Each structure stands twice: as structure tokens, then as C-alpha cells.
């Protein structure tokens, strides 16, 4: 079992915080069935993910993209809802300035005063 240190990984990912995020996400990917790129050697998933990073046996861009897409909160069909809202807003009748002034004048003439 080869010992992996943070110094080995920092050479590949200079930011420690990014390293932790990438290694944790890669460990989750392994747990969910992603194929290993190195021998497990009886190591746990987080250690395997760090070893993969240290040995550059995985594409970190792929892991980073998977992490980002996993963190995005998009419901299925949300894009369709947004597009439907845009279409509805464009199709809605828009009140002109004259329409607003006429409605205001009619309200004034009716003597309604809802203010208290």
C-alpha cells in the first residue's frame, strides 16, 4: 500500500480547498460505481481518490465538471417552465400609458377613495 500525502496532491491541485472538494467528489464517484484507474490495494475510497489525483491517472477536469453539475440545483423541467413563462410574458397584453391614465381618471371620477 503506497502512502499518499497532501504534498503529492498539492503539486497537481495547488489549492487545498479545491483538492478536498475534488477528492471527496471522486470518492463519491467511486462509491457509486465509477471504475478505478489504479489498484485499490485495500484502501478506502477517499485514499484511492487521493492516490488517483497524485498519480494523475484521472482527468481532473472531468471530476470538476461532475462536481459542478452535481452542485447545481436544477429541477427536471425547470428550463421548460422558464421558457413557458417568457412566452407568456411576451404574449400578455401590455397596458399603454394612455390606458393607465384613463383607468386612473375613471377611478378619480368615481369618487372612490380606498385610502384610510
UniProtKB/Swiss-Prot annotation:
Cellular component per GO, a single term: DNA-directed RNA polymerase complex
Entries under Pfam families matching the protein: RNA_pol_Rpb6
Keyword field: DNA-directed RNA polymerase, Nucleotidyltransferase, Transcription, Transferase
Entry's Gene Ontology molecular function annotations: DNA binding; DNA-directed RNA polymerase activity
Gene3D superfamilies listed in its UniProt record: 3.90.940.10
EC number: 2.7.7.6
Gene Ontology biological process terms from the UniProt entry: DNA-templated transcription
Reactions performed catalytically: RNA(n) + a ribonucleoside 5'-triphosphate = RNA(n+1) + diphosphate
Self-association and partners: The RNAP catalytic core consists of 2 alpha, 1 beta, 1 beta' and 1 omega subunit. When a sigma factor is associated with the core the holoenzyme is formed, which can initiate transcription.
NCBIfam families: rpoZ
Functional description taken from the UniProt entry: Promotes RNA polymerase assembly. Latches the N- and C-terminal regions of the beta' subunit thereby facilitating its interaction with the beta and alpha subunits.
The family this protein is said to belong to: Belongs to the RNA polymerase subunit omega family.
HAMAP family: RNApol_bact_RpoZ (MF_00366)
Name of the protein described by the UniProt record: DNA-directed RNA polymerase subunit omega
Lineage: Bacteria, Pseudomonadati, Pseudomonadota, Alphaproteobacteria, Hyphomonadales
Amino acid at each position: 500500500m503506497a502512502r499518499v500525502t497532501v504534498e503529492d496532491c498539492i503539486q497537481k491541485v495547488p489549492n487545498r480547498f479545491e483538492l478536498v472538494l475534488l477528492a471527496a467528489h471522486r470518492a463519491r464517484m467511486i462509491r457509486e460505481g465509477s471504475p478505478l484507474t489504479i489498484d485499490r490495494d485495500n484502501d478506502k475510497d477517499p485514499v484511492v481518490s487521493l492516490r488517483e489525483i497524485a498519480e494523475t491517472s484521472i482527468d481532473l477536469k472531468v471530476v470538476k465538471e461532475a462536481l459542478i453539475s452535481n452542485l447545481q440545483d436544477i429541477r427536471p423541467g425547470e428550463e421548460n417552465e422558464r421558457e413557458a413563462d417568457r412566452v407568456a410574458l411576451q404574449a400578455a397584453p401590455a397596458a399603454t400609458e394612455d390606458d393607465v391614465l384613463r383607468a386612473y381618471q375613471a377611478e378619480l371620477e368615481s369618487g372612490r377613495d380606498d385610502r384610510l
